[in-house]
Design a protein with these regions (language model features):
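Hydrophobic h-region of N-terminal signal peptides that target proteins for export
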Residues: 10-19
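Functional cores that coordinate and move charged inorganic groups
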Residues: 112, 154-155
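Sequence context of c-type cytochrome heme-c attachment sites
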Residues: 18-106, 111, 117-141, 161-179
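Alpha-helical multi-pass transmembrane bundles of energy-transducing inner-membrane proteins
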Residues: 143-150
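Sec-dependent signal peptide recognition
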Residues: 2-9
Length: 179
C-alpha cells in the first residue's frame, strides 16, 4: 500500500504537466502546406476566400474602433482582448508558443477552430485521429458549439446566425476517398 502511494506521488507531477501542455501555433501557411490540394480538400483556398481570413484586418478599421468605443473600451479594437478573442488566433498565448510562420493578421485561421498544431502537424500523427487529439487537435461533437462561441448575441455586430447556410460556404472537410 505504501509503495503504491509513493509511485502515485512520484508520477503525479508528470501527469499534471502532461495534462496542462500548451501546444504551439504554426500558422495558416504551415497548415496549408498539406491542406491546399484538391485531393486533400482545398482547405487553404476555402479559408482564403472566407471572411474568417479577414477577421483581424476588420479590427484595424475606423468602424471597428468606433464600435469598441461605443462598447466602453478605451483601446483601439485591434488592441482590445474582447475583440481579439473572436477575430484572431493566438492573441492571448505566450509569444514562445507562436511559430515562425504564425501571423496574427491571418485572423480566424486553422488553429482557431482546430487547435494549435505544432504537436499534431506531422503526417504520422495526423494519420491517427486519436494521436492528433492527444497532441492538440480539437474535435467538436457539434460544429455549432464552436461557431456560437463568437457568433452570438454578445457580439456587437451580431446578426441572425444561420449555421447551415454559413457552414455551407466554409465547410472544408477532408474527402473520404483521397485516391
Amino acid at each position: 500500500m505504501l509503495l503504491r502511494f509513493f509511485i502515485i506521488l512520484f508520477f503525479l507531477p508528470t501527469f499534471f504537466a502532461y495534462s496542462q501542455t500548451q501546444h504551439g501555433y504554426i500558422g495558416t501557411s504551415a497548415c496549408g502546406m498539406c491542406h491546399k490540394t484538391e485531393k486533400q480538400g482545398n482547405q487553404l483556398s476555402i479559408w482564403q476566400g472566407s471572411k474568417h481570413s479577414q477577421a483581424y484586418l476588420t479590427l484595424q478599421t475606423e468602424k471597428a474602433d468606433q464600435i469598441a468605443k461605443e462598447k466602453g473600451f478605451q483601446t483601439k479594437a485591434v488592441e482590445t482582448p474582447e475583440c481579439l478573442k473572436c477575430h484572431a488566433s493566438g492573441y492571448n498565448v505566450d509569444a514562445s508558443l507562436l511559430g515562425e510562420k504564425f501571423k496574427i493578421e491571418d485572423g480566424v485561421q486553422c488553429e482557431t477552430c482546430h487547435g494549435a498544431g505544432a504537436d499534431y502537424k506531422s503526417k504520422k500523427v495526423m494519420e491517427s485521429r486519436e494521436e492528433s487529439v492527444k497532441n492538440g487537435l480539437k474535435v467538436y461533437e457539434k460544429t455549432e458549439d464552436l461557431c456560437i462561441s463568437c457568433h452570438n448575441a454578445e457580439s456587437p455586430t451580431y446578426v441572425d446566425f444561420k449555421l447551415e447556410e454559413y457552414w455551407a460556404k466554409i465547410k472544408h472537410m477532408v474527402p473520404e476517398n483521397k485516391n
